[in-house]
């Protein structure tokens, strides 16, 4: 999304923290979401009562790929030495439910799966509580108009009310 905003293809976007501090880009905090490590209950990491440090490295970690050239060669939240990179969060979710690998997911997206037993929250010593911050972004030289400014403000207020 950041690349689309910087190139002028999009005037406003919602992005994560990966591009914090880029020249020519303004950012307004509009929320965050907790990322938690999960796997299907049949996965070895889910079956273990207590995973030892480093246990997750031995299993395929499903990661969301960032196709932007701005983050080329950078990894975020990678624990495993064996990973599959996916372009879509929905595909990652489907593979996790199917028992293929483990990975960090937005807690609201997997809440029903955790409650129903389709996924299990993993206890991993190397995983620290992760909140993924989200910002509305726009080019410094092209501030949002009234409608986009209202939308950004609305996102920010909604986030303050729910977090």
Task: Describe every region a protein language model picked out.
Residues 1, 91, 143-144:
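Short phosphate-engaging motifs
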């Amino acid at each position: 999304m950041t690349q689309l905003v910087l190139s002028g293809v999009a005037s406003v976007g919602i992005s994560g923290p990966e591009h914090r501090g880029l020249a020519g880009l303004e950012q307004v905090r509009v929320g965050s979401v907790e990322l938690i490590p999960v796997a299907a209950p049949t996965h070895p990491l889910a079956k273990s009562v207590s995973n030892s440090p480093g246990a997750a490295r031995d299993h395929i970690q499903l990661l969301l790929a960032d196709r932007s050239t701005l983050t080329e060669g950078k990894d975020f939240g990678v624990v495993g030495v064996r990973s599959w990179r996916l372009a879509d969060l929905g595909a990652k979710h489907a593979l996790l439910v199917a028992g293929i690998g483990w990975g960090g997911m937005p807690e609201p997206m997997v809440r029903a799966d955790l409650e129903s037993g389709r996924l299990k929250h993993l206890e991993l010593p190397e995983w620290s509580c992760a909140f993924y911050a989200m910002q509305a972004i726009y080019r410094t030289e092209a501030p949002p108009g009234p409608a986009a400014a209202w939308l950004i403000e609305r996102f920010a207020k909604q986030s303050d009310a729910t977090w």
